[in-house]
Amino acid sequence: GDIYEGLLEKNAEDTKSGAGQYFTPRPLIRAMVECVQPQPGKTIADPACGTGGFFLAAYDYLAAQPALDKEQKAFLKNSTFHGNEIVAGTRRLCLMNMLLHNIGEIDGQSTISPNDALIADDGRRFDYVLANPPFGKKSSMSFTNAEGGEETDELTYNRQDFWATTSNKQLNFLQHIRSMLRTTGQAAVVLPDNVLFEGGAGETVRRKLLETTELHTVLRLPTGIFYAQGVKANVLFFDNKPARKEPWTREVWIYDYRTNIHHTLKKKPLRFEDLQDFIACYHPSSRHARKETWHETDNPEGRWRKYGLEQILARDKTSLDIFWLKDKSLADLENLPEPDDLAEEIIENIEAGLNSFREILKGLG
């Protein structure tokens, strides 16, 4: 099973525009699982499960728990994991990956659906959602026009349970993930920067998320860790809550693992050890015991800082795109990264800009 995982990662490297978009860095997945700490006998879902990375990490975490009884072991093998993957080849890779790691049965009913998770609420609710929905801002579908040529049409999902109707794929996944959770469910989701700052539907979704869930943590990720180039992403951690008038979120803790952090896929890839400080700050076993590492005078370089709900609501468009650390790369000319690292970072930033312009062009078209 581990050899197969290694081959999937190698394939992701070789096909950046192909399998790479379905492959989340395994150290990041492991850190997310360590923070969420899923419990035996609970269900775990991923509405865009790719090759099954989140399932495998959660399985390893749960299988390592001491004294699992026979029922819990059977539940872990056959009933814990539920996913969707619309790309047929990727779904097959996922099913094989899971079977090789002793999840499910070859002749059993698959818990990985080939259906588009966003089309409708199927009514099922889960204890945990761990996900990295596909990058690419717009949802679209291809069709053949009258002249026999192929066109794409912007796709919006008109769902009564969504707070906002939008063609932004990530905002739709975020709304869907919230709807998948049990009242006590927890989510950890990788999402691009636009989800944090986009106006219109983006602001509506952020406000509703702050009101109806406890959005307690945002991990800002560096560039250079994903196979899809130019991706600037974050992990949002939130707990679902029962309905009430007052907002459930009182403060959001932000860990900036982007400013002055340099990773590349080959020379300096992200390692699990790199996220140890974040996990320690997250304080998985008792979040109420968290302490800021940032201090205005004593430690202005601290990466861990909290913002009250009022501070966030007062920001333009309720933006969660928050930074406070100074970018040293411009000031510290003595300690610039290696030329090839610098070149790769420049390419990442240009790619990110180009991707934004492509989305604008699509919108104008």
Can you say where each PLM-predicted feature lies in the sequence?
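Conserved phosphate/pyrophosphate-binding and hydrolysis machinery centered on Walker-type P-loop NTPases
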Residues: 1, 18-25, 167, 336
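Generic structural signal for individual residues within well-ordered alpha-helical segments
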Residues: 1, 29-30, 343
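Long recognition/docking surfaces used for binding and targeting
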Residues: 1-12
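General structural signal for alpha-helix termini and helix-helix connectors
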Residues: 13, 17, 330-331
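Conserved S-adenosyl-L-methionine
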Residues: 18-131, 135-149, 171, 191-194, ...
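A conserved structural/catalytic subdomain of Rossmann-like adenosyl-cofactor enzymes
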Residues: 120-365
